[in-house]
């Protein structure tokens, strides 16, 4: 019977300890206290024995586009153009995509150039919010 077969039915703490002994898990990922069941990451404070809440947030995507519709309440449709290079012919091709964007104060109008930022899902298709209006339509 191999060591892996013996560890298959073991408790999670024992499996983590066995994996650390075999070198499959980095030592930094295994908790020193078996009662903590292999706490991971920088959010675990070994001295206090508690898990600290990580309040940092990852970088959110930003896009710049043109408002093409403002008919809905607190929602605008923004068209974002990107240039992609064709893999074989190397010609730059214009691609556009429409995003539904949350506009809390209904301040964007058709023709405005706006900066939008990724956010939590607000509805089925709305996952962006208005960050700022770069230039107004004339």
Curated annotation (Swiss-Prot):
Amino acid composition bias (Basic and acidic residues), ranges on this chain: 1-18, 43-55
GO cellular component: cytosolic small ribosomal subunit
Single annotated GO MF: structural constituent of ribosome
InterPro entries: NA-bd_OB-fold, Ribosomal_uS17, Ribosomal_uS17_bact/chlr, Ribosomal_uS17_CS
Pfam families: Ribosomal_S17
Top-level taxonomic group: Bacteria
Keyword entries, A-Z: Ribonucleoprotein, Ribosomal protein, RNA-binding, rRNA-binding
SUPFAM superfamilies for the chain: Nucleic acid-binding proteins
Gene3D superfamilies given in the database record: Nucleic acid-binding proteins
Record flagged with keyword Ribonucleoprotein: yes
GO biological process: translation
Regions crossing the membrane: none
Family: Belongs to the universal ribosomal protein uS17 family.
Assembly behavior: Part of the 30S ribosomal subunit.
Function comment: One of the primary rRNA binding proteins, it binds specifically to the 5'-end of 16S ribosomal RNA.
Protein name: Small ribosomal subunit protein uS17
Taxon lineage: Bacteria, Bacillati, Actinomycetota, Rubrobacteria, Rubrobacterales
């Amino acid at each position: 019977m191999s060591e892996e077969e013996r560890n298959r039915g073991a408790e999670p703490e024992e499996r983590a300890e066995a994996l650390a002994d075999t070198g499959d898990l980095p030592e930094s990922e295994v908790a020193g206290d078996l009662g903590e069941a292999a706490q991971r990451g920088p959010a675990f404070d070994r001295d206090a024995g508690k898990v600290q809440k990580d309040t940092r947030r990852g970088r959110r995507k930003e896009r710049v586009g043109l408002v093409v519709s403002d008919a809905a309440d607190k929602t605008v449709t923004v068209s974002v153009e990107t240039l992609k290079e064709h893999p074989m012919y190397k010609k730059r091709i214009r691609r556009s995509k429409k995003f539904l964007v949350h506009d809390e104060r209904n301040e964007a109008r058709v023709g405005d150039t706006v900066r939008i930022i990724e956010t939590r899902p607000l509805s089925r298709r709305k996952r962006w919010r208005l960050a700022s209006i770069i230039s107004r339509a004339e």
